[in-house]
């Protein structure tokens, strides 16, 4: 009984936090699912969350690759520009805001990250190829981070 009460208390705390953020529980789980799809390192979940929160605040498209992977049949692949143009309510490159629902079953770490994003000004991130990401506040720095990633990828072939 004590464990059930503790578990229910956690649920209500998370629901209160979602309300503080202006999100429904469904929206929190949807955002958490994107974080789950994006984060390879637990230490980056709240930073990735901050990017999405910051984008939502300024009505910027989320441009989340996991949402594209979700709508493409088959195993994950390197995305093409054509993939980014697929017509779907889940395509966060084409649509503003969150997709209609979760794209996977997020773990508790991603749910916590969705509820408690790191306080940053980051608007962009790019994978580094080792599971980590480079986070940036503007498009110029983001393009530079992408350029460096491509150079390093070529070197490591």
Where are the language model's segments positioned?
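Bacterial extracytoplasmic/cell-wall-associated proteins, especially those involved in peptidoglycan
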Residues: 6-157
